Structure formats: structure tokens, C-alpha cells
UniProtKB/Swiss-Prot annotation:
Gene: trpE
Keyword flag Oxidoreductase: no
Residues the entry annotates as binding Mg(2+): E381, E518
Binding sites annotated in the UniProt record for L-tryptophan: S61, P311, Y312, M313
Keywords: Amino-acid biosynthesis, Aromatic amino acid biosynthesis, Lyase, Magnesium, Metal-binding, Tryptophan biosynthesis
Organism: Vibrio parahaemolyticus serotype O3:K6 (strain RIMD 2210633)
The protein's enzyme class: lyase
Protein name as it appears in the record: Anthranilate synthase component 1
Lineage: Bacteria, Pseudomonadati, Pseudomonadota, Gammaproteobacteria, Vibrionales
MF annotations from Gene Ontology: anthranilate synthase activity; metal ion binding
Catalysed reaction, written as an equation: chorismate + L-glutamine = anthranilate + pyruvate + L-glutamate + H(+)
Entry's family note: Belongs to the anthranilate synthase component I family.
Subunit-level organization: Heterotetramer consisting of two non-identical subunits: a beta subunit (TrpG) and a large alpha subunit (TrpE).
Pfam families from the UniProt entry: Anth_synt_I_N, Chorismate_bind
Protein purpose: Part of a heterotetrameric complex that catalyzes the two-step biosynthesis of anthranilate, an intermediate in the biosynthesis of L-tryptophan. In the first step, the glutamine-binding beta subunit (TrpG) of anthranilate synthase (AS) provides the glutamine amidotransferase activity which generates ammonia as a substrate that, along with chorismate, is used in the second step, catalyzed by the large alpha subunit of AS (TrpE) to produce anthranilate. In the absence of TrpG, TrpE can synthesize anthranilate directly from chorismate and high concentrations of ammonia.
Length: 541
């Protein structure tokens, strides 16, 4: 039988499971709730309530086929910012409520983990996992993932809302380098290995029922209750009349500059094919960056949402960067209620069939789909990644529960169509969603197979950290649910400059120019959205 949340907490309290956490006492929570007027456009809510405030996050979902909005989750205020660099994790209290949270969770850190706490910042130092022990044992070693578990498990959730503890944020692609020997790489931006926010005020917008609920979580005691009640009234008032987005800063003749020109990228593809011929790998996914001005990222995100609605859409406003995107692909999903773990591999891409005026030519589009489904190379590449997903899911699932729920479907987006599949299983009783993510990172569609060797080759040819690209953005709840998407079809923005990164799967019979073209095709939806947003007024309905 599956361990419920309380069962997991008992194990942690007894010190039987976790080497970094010892629950000495469960803290108390109080969740304050209020209904607010429904708004169809969450970007207007974000602009109205958050504007330029950092440590805020908007997560949105849409139905794949109809493109209808489903739900939007907005972290308005964060109590704590959790940031990981290498094996060092720092918790920064952003409010008095956040200080109360840190004071409590600090009591539950095991003595074996080096820690320092000054009342506002808690720093944990983890050690490099031993690479001589087996994979299962490595999952149980103390690691930077335990910093997130510390918040998850330090409070009594027995009678609380599922979002009472809500952590939203980003796992960078390079987080895996803390666990696997990938080699050195330079940084092209300031992206940490991960950054998560513990929500203090959370806005939940249900587009199906056209309802909107605001909640605030009071940690440990009631000392900040009056302040939170006042903040709720503040936000409610702002939600009654959401402001239109201001006009985006106009930029003339925006062009995207590739980090690697076509000729050089083609040579990278040829070089990597040699490793396929030698049998080192079956597939590898090199990428390149396209940079362009993006002084108004929220306007660009709104344009991207309208032009390329996707199952996962996100806008993250950190103190170091802004990240936005419309991703077609789930990274890893775990639902506590069903105990199901899920990976959604996407591989096999074609441009949409369009007329010269840009409208979809449905007859041409259908013929392109047929050609995609019939392409032996694309099918072989896709099935290779389905097998990789099957292996990943099998390692963390109960015996006999892993299966392929969907195989070789076609999902359509504004500029491209993809072959997609879905692999599911029942998570083992001795693991949680973070164990599952650690075991599976990074997703095979952004690495190749075998995964570790492919990631090493990617480091060799790219020479730089990928940062957010190929990582995962999403949320984790106190009761254990994890929902993340792969950070693709996205823009990472620092100092008004966007980095749009895209890759292509290289196999034995890859055509170098076709792979270079594929990176442009995948990046185009985001590039076009940035260009469109900065060449016209943003405040359209």
C-alpha cells in the first residue's frame, strides 16, 4: 500500500529515511483564503499585482488539442527564496513570515549537514555523492534536493489544503553536473542550479469554472496574521481592476544572432555522428543559442501565449533573470492521489503546412503529418527516446507497473508539429517525486542516449552551461505532488537581452543542415513572439 503523507512524515521523524532531515517537531500552518474577481488574462493580473517585483512566478496550463486555458497559478509573494549553487543551498527569508518558517525548519536539519543560520538566511552545505555506491543508494544520500524536502516535511499538513505548502521554481539543466561527471563548462548567464520560491500568497485561477481564489499561508504562529490579512485585502482590491499591459519598448529591426553559425553547427553534427558510428552513443542533442533584444519580456510572453498556446506556459521573475516560455513537453509529473509518475517524450518535428500568407493549409499540413509518421529516421529516433523513458520510469516504479500509455501521437503548435508518447508507472513506496526527478534528469529528449555519455559530449561540443534550457520549471507541494515541464520554446532574459536556445537530435543518418534548420524552426516561435511584441503596442485584448 502507498505511504500517505503522514506515513512519510513518521518515517522522517524516526530518522529512518533521510540523512539530512530529522523532524523533531511538526510546525503548524494556517491558510487564509479569499475569493477574488475572475480575470481571463493572467498576464494582466501579473502586471497589476507583481509588476517589477522579483521572486514571483506565473504557471499556466492549456489543453493540447483545443488550446483552451485550463489553470493559472501565480505566486504573488514569496516567503522564502531557495537557491542552489553546486552543493550549497541558501534559504533567504523575504518576509517576517519567512523568517518564522526558517527558524522552524532550521531545527530539523541533521547535525551531519553543515549549516549556518543568522535569523534571515539559512545555508546548508552538502557533500559530493560517492560515485562508488550503487544508483539506489546514491538516491538516498543527503543532497541539495533535501533542502526542498526540509520545507515539505517540516509542517503538519494533516488537515490542510493541497497548496498549503507550495514551492514553485526552476531546476537548471546543469543541476545534473552535481551528481554526474560531465566535465567543466563556462557560464553564459547567472542561472543557479535551482531556484525555488515558497509561496506566501498564491492566486489560483480556474479558467474552466471562471473562478479565482487567493490564499495566504501563515507559518508557525499567528504573529503575522494581521499583516497577511491586510495583504489579502490589498491584492483583492488590485484584482478588481487589472491594468492593461503598457506598450512594449519598441525596437527597430530586431534580429536573432546564433551563438554558432550554421556552418559550424553542421560540423558539430558531423563530429557527433562519429561517436554514433563508433557505438559510444545512439543519439545526442546538441543545441545553440539565439540572442536578441527583449526589454519588455511580459509583453513578449503574452504574444507567445497568443501565438503558440501550449500545455505548459510560464513566466518567472527572479532577482537575477526573467524566464518565460510555452513548452509542449512535460519533464516529470507525479500525482500523489494516483501515485502515478509520468514522462512525455517528444521527438520528431516538422514545420506546419502554411500558405504564403501564413495561414494553415490543412491539406498540406495533413500530408506533412503523414510524411512525419512515415519517416523511418524520425520513428527510430522517437522509439529510442521512448525506450529511454521506459528505462527511467522502470528504475523508480513498482515492478510491473511501467507501461506506454500513448505511442506516436502528433501534437500541433503554431510553427511545428511533433511526434509524442507518454510513459507511466506507479512510484515505489520508498521514493518520492524528488528522488524520481534526480533519477531521471535530464529528460532524454534534451540529452540523447545513453544519457550520461550524451550529456558529456554535449558539454564537450557546447563548452558552456545550458542554464535554464533543458532543465525543468514547475511546482512541488507539501503533500508530494510534482508537476514540471522541460524548459524549451523559452527565453532566458538578463539585462534586456534574451537567450533562446534550441537543439536537434543527432543519429546515424542525420543530415547536418537539416539539424541546423531544426534548431531554427524550434526557436522561431519564441523569436517571432519577441519580435512581434517589440514592434507593436502590447496592450491589446
Amino acid at each position: 500500500m502507498r505511504l500517505c503523507t503522514a506515513g512519510r512524515l513518521k518515517q522522517l521523524q524516526g530518522g529512518l529515511v533521510n540523512k539530512a532531515i530529522e523532524i523533531k517537531k511538526l510546525g503548524q500552518l494556517e491558510v487564509l483564503k479569499a475569493s477574488v474577481p475572475y480575470t481571463q488574462d493572467p498576464t494582466r493580473l501579473f502586471h497589476t499585482i507583481c509588476e517589477n517585483k522579483t521572486d514571483s512566478l506565473l504557471l499556466e496550463s492549456a489543453e493540447i488539442d483545443s488550446k483552451q486555458n485550463l489553470k493559472s497559478l501565480l505566486i504573488v509573494d514569496s516567503a522564502v527564496r531557495i537557491v542552489c549553487y553546486g552543493h550549497t543551498v541558501s534559504f533567504h527569508a523575504l518576509t517576517e513570515n519567512g523568517k518564522n518558517l526558517l527558524t522552524h525548519v532550521n531545527q530539523n536539519v541533521r547535525g551531519e549537514v553543515a549549516s549556518q543560520f543568522d535569523g534571515e538566511t539559512l545555508t546548508l552545505e552538502f557533500i559530493q555523492p560517492c560515485d562508488t555506491i550503487d544508483e539506489d543508494s546514491r538516491l538516498r544520500e543527503a543532497s541539495s534536493f533535501d533542502a526542498l524536502r526540509l520545507v515539505q516535511h517540516s509542517f503538519d499538513l494533516s488537515s490542510q489544503d493541497k497548496h498549503a505548502i507550495f514551492l514553485g521554481g526552476l531546476f537548471a539543466y546543469d543541476l545534473v553536473a552535481n551528481f554526474e561527471p560531465l566535465g567543466d563548462a563556462v557560464a553564459t548567464n547567472q542561472c543557479p542550479d535551482y531556484v525555488f520560491y515558497v509561496a506566501e500568497t498564491l492566486l489560483v485561477v480556474d479558467h474552466q469554472t471562471e473562478s479565482c481564489q487567493l490564499q495566504a499561508t501563515l507559518f508557525v504562529d499567528g504573529s503575522q496574521k494581521a499583516a497577511l490579512e491586510s495583504r489579502i485585502e490589498d491584492i483583492r482590491a488590485q484584482c478588481t481592476s487589472p491594468k492593461r499591459l503598457p506598450d512594449a519598448t519598441q525596437v527597430a529591426n530586431i534580429t536573432a544572432q546564433p551563438s554558432v553559425p550554421d556552418q559550424d553547427f553542421c560540423q558539430i553534427v558531423r563530429d557527433l555522428k562519429e561517436f554514433v558510428v563508433k557505438g559510444d552513443i545512439f543519439q545526442v542533442v546538441p543545441s545553440r543559442r539565439f540572442t536578441l533584444p527583449c526589454p519588455s519580456p511580459l509583453a513578449a510572453y503574452k504574444e507567445l501565449k497568443q501565438s503558440n498556446p501550449s500545455p505548459y506556459m510560464f513566466y518567472m521573475q527572479d532577482e537575477l533573470f526573467t524566464l518565460f516560455g510555452a513548452s509542449p513537453e512535460s519533464a516529470l509529473k507525479y500525482e500523489t492521489d494516483t501515485n502515478q509518475i509520468e514522462i512525455y517524450p517528444i521527438a520528431g518535428t516538422r514545420r506546419r503546412g502554411k500558405r504564403p500568407n501564413g495561414e494553415i493549409d490543412f491539406d498540406l499540413d495533413s500530408r506533412i503529418e503523414l510524411e512525419l509518421r512515415s519517416d523511418k529516421k524520425e520513428n527510430a529516433e522517437h522509439m529510442m527516446l521512448v525506450d529511454l523513458a521506459r528505462n527511467d520510469v522502470a528504475r523508480i516504479s513498482q515492478a510491473g507497473t511501467r507501461h506506454v500509455a500513448d505511442l506516436l501521437k502528433v501534437d500541433r503548435y503554431s510553427h511545428v508539429m511533433h511526434l509524442v508518447s507518454r510513459v507511466v508507472g506507479q512510484l515505489r513506496d520508498d521514493l518520492d517525486a524528488l528522488h524520481a526527478y534526480q533519477a531521471c534528469m535530464n529528460m532524454g529528449t534534451l540529452t540523447g542516449a545513453p544519457k550520461i555519455r550524451a550529456m558529456q559530449l554535449i558539454r564537450d561540443v557546447e563548452g558552456a552551461r545550458r542554464g535554464s534550457y533543458g532543465g525543468a520549471v514547475g511546482y512541488l507541494t507539501g503533500e508530494g505532488t510534482l508537476d514540471t515541464c522541460i524548459v524549451i520554446r523559452s527565453a532566458y532574459v538578463e539585462n534586456g537581452i534574451a537567450q533562446v536556445q534550441a537543439g536537434a537530435g543527432v543519429v546515424f543518418d542525420s543530415d547536418p543542415q537539416a539539424e541546423a534548420d531544426e534548431t531554427r524552426g524550434k526557436a522561431q516561435a519564441v523569436i517571432s513572439a519577441i519580435q512581434a511584441a517589440h514592434s507593436q503596442p502590447a496592450n491589446k485584448e
